[in-house]
Amino acid sequence: MEGYKSFLAFLVSSLLLGFLGVIFTLVWVLHWREGLGWDGGAAEFNWHPVLVTSGFIFIQGIAIIVYRLPWTWKCSKLLMKFIHAGLHLTALIFTIVALVAVFDFHNAKNIPNMYSLHSWIGLTVVILYALQLVLGVSIYLLPFASNTLRAALMPVHVYSGLFIFGTVIATALMGITEKLIFSLKEPPYSKLPPEAIFVNTFGLLILVFGGLVVWMVTTPAWKRPREQGMEILSPTVSSPDETEEGSTITDCSNTEKSDVELNSEAARKRILKLDEAGQRSTM
């Protein structure tokens, strides 16, 4: 892999930022909000940001970059497809529970559903994500689609996945801003109390996390090799000079082998000529 150290830096940074985003969400709802529960109250609503951040953002981000991990390139493509689909399915389950939590809370408090832009885009992107998962499994995991169809739809599959991922992060940023505006009264959000600063920082974390994931998955040099027998490059890969040297040694060995074969053939012909001459002299 070209730029292995750069890839490793991006990977570690993205995982750290994503994990910090999950921690920030938990600290937010446990310290400044009402905690977590499942009673139709505010504590049930708090599952919504926690599950969206951990599942729809963090786990989905891992699912997107899992093919780019060079340590998995020796694994079979089928196994990686199962891992890729399994992570996406886990993210979808987290998201569905998050939707149930927010609808339960709204219904228990007689709060209208689906009136804000956040809710419109949020539900739309969940539906698109579910369709993406179903179509991805049907075309790329199950053995029904032809290779031609798979190759033709791959650019659409990749683009729609990145579009959904980016839309999820944008919708999450809208949601946390909306929550702060509704919840912070004394002092208001405009006064930037500690909770506002903390949650704004959380928003920056998931935004940068998304940017790093998109960068890793769109860098051609970090793409998983296509051929089964392709050499897997790692930090300990031989340098081009070493590869050239190995090629030279192989060529030299082949040359020596050819010389030996030629000498053996010449000796055999000389022996045959001597035998023929001996037979003539005897006659």
Curated annotation (Swiss-Prot):
Residues 234-262 are annotated as: Disordered. It is found in: Cell membrane; Apical cell membrane. GO terms for molecular function: identical protein binding; metal ion binding; oxidoreductase activity; transmembrane ascorbate ferrireductase activity; transmembrane monodehydroascorbate reductase activity. Residues 31-45, 104-116, 178-195 are extracellular. It comes from Xenopus laevis. One of its GO terms (biological process) is ascorbate homeostasis. Keywords: Cell membrane, Electron transport, Heme, Iron, Membrane, Metal-binding, Oxidoreductase, Translocase, Transmembrane, Transmembrane helix, Transport. It catalyses: Fe(3+)(out) + L-ascorbate(in) = monodehydro-L-ascorbate radical(in) + Fe(2+)(out) + H(+); Cu(2+)(out) + L-ascorbate(in) = Cu(+)(out) + monodehydro-L-ascorbate radical(in) + H(+); monodehydro-L-ascorbate radical(out) + L-ascorbate(in) = monodehydro-L-ascorbate radical(in) + L-ascorbate(out). Its cofactor is heme b. Residues 13-218 form the Cytochrome b561 domain. This is Plasma membrane ascorbate-dependent reductase CYBRD1. The lineage of its organism: Eukaryota, Metazoa, Chordata, Craniata, Vertebrata. Fe(3+) binds at residue 106.
